[in-house]
């Protein structure tokens, strides 16, 4: 799937309030890089970061996939800047997908959160 195709699929399957102006920067095989932006004056809440994790995991595993198990470690506060999500599929077994996601604050390029998940496609 190309970046443009993935962008369209995510926009179709992600509620508008959860998109955070998402932009697919790179989509290669099972690795995906997506940028998320805040509305000026807002800050990233943990709930917003987990929403981004869900979207980024689906970007790698398949936009119709649903998270069945999630383990997340919040490493530090996110800066009031764009967040970059790097997600990748670790293993596929039938309709089960194991994936991980890293979130980075774009302003200082530091990891903000790491998550591992199991999804059903």
Model-predicted regions and their roles:
Residues 18-24, 68-74, 85-86:
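Short structured motifs
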Residues 1, 62, 69, 76-80, ...:
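HotDog/MaoC-like acyl-thioester-processing domains
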Residues 44-67:
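Active-site helix/loop of acyl-thioester processing domains in fatty-acid/polyketide metabolism
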Residues 15-19, 65, 94-96:
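Short solvent-exposed loop/turn micro-motifs enriched in small/polar/acidic residues
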Residues 1-37:
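Non-catalytic linker/capping segments at the edges of enzyme domains
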Residues 36-46:
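A short interface-forming secondary-structure element
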Residues 30-32, 78-83:
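A short, glycine/Asx- and small/polar-enriched loop/turn
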């Amino acid at each position: 799937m190309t970046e443009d195709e993935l962008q369209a699929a995510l926009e179709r399957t992600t509620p508008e309030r959860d998109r955070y102006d998402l932009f697919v920067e790179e989509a290669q095989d099972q690795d995906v890089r997506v940028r998320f932006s805040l509305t000026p004056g807002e800050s990233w809440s943990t709930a917003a970061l987990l929403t981004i994790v869900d979207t980024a995991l689906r970007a790698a595993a398949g936009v119709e996939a649903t998270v069945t198990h999630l383990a997340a470690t919040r490493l530090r506060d996110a800066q009031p800047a764009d967040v970059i999500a790097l997600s990748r599929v670790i293993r596929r077994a039938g309709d089960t997908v194991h994936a991980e996601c890293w979130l980075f604050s774009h302003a200082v390029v530091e990891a903000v959160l790491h998550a591992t998940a199991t999804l059903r496609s």
